[in-house]
């Protein structure tokens, strides 16, 4: 039986070789995976908000895209990943409330923008994404392959894709 590590909101997990790392209920939050195909080291971050500084660095650093991504990177490198081989995949960032006009409240969009900016700053390639829209997502990172299975519910219809 395959071991599954479940990642909650504002948390992350890393692993090597075998098993699944998953997170459920990505709405405006983003799920970011990092994976090294050679060492089969990977990790997943479930971030709630874009930038720690904007919120006074309050609470758990994994709650924020910018500081959480740094934590995730540090941990996959500790397990033997090479920064130069890492590939990132990005999910979530939905607009959960339809009539929001304020950019300040478009958390999903800001989470996605921050994730892309931080990945670029760190020199990590973004190789796949499924972001935006209105549906919630669940993702499963397979540590043996680096593939991410995504389930999305839109208007009662379940859509599954592998990235």
Swiss-Prot record:
GO process terms (BP): chemotaxis
Keywords annotated in UniProt: Chemotaxis, Hydrolase
Organism encoding this protein: Pyrococcus abyssi (strain GE5 / Orsay)
Pfam families per UniProt: CheD
GO molecular function: protein-glutamine glutaminase activity
InterPro entries, A to Z: CheD-like_sf (IPR038592), Chemorcpt_Glu_NH3ase_CheD (IPR005659), Cytotoxic_necrot_fac-like_cat (IPR011324)
Catalysed conversion reaction: L-glutaminyl-[protein] + H2O = L-glutamyl-[protein] + NH4(+)
Name the UniProt record assigns to this protein: Probable chemoreceptor glutamine deamidase CheD
Enzyme class name: hydrolase
Function: Probably deamidates glutamine residues to glutamate on methyl-accepting chemotaxis receptors (MCPs), playing an important role in chemotaxis.
EC number(s) stated in the UniProt entry for this protein: 3.5.1.44
Family: Belongs to the CheD family.
């Amino acid at each position: 039986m395959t071991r599954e590590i479940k990642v909650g909101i504002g948390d992350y997990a890393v692993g090597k070789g075998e098993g699944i790392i998953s997170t459920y209920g990505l709405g405006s939050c983003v799920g970011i995976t990092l994976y090294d195909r050679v060492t089969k080291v990977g990790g997943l971050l479930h971030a709630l908000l874009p930038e720690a500084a904007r919120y006074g660095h309050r609470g758990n650093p994994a709650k924020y895209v910018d500081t959480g991504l740094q934590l995730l990177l540090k941990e996959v490198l500790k397990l033997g990943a090479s920064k130069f081989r890492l590939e990132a995949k990005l999910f979530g960032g939905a607009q959960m409330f339809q009539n929001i006009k304020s950019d300040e409240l478009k958390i999903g969009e800001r989470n996605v923008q921050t994730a892309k900016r931080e990945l670029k700053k760190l020199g990590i390639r973004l190789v796949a994404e499924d972001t935006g829209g209105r549906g919630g997502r669940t993702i499963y990172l397979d540590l043996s392959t680096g593939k991410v299975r995504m389930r999305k519910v839109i208007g009662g219809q379940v859509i599954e894709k592998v990235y």
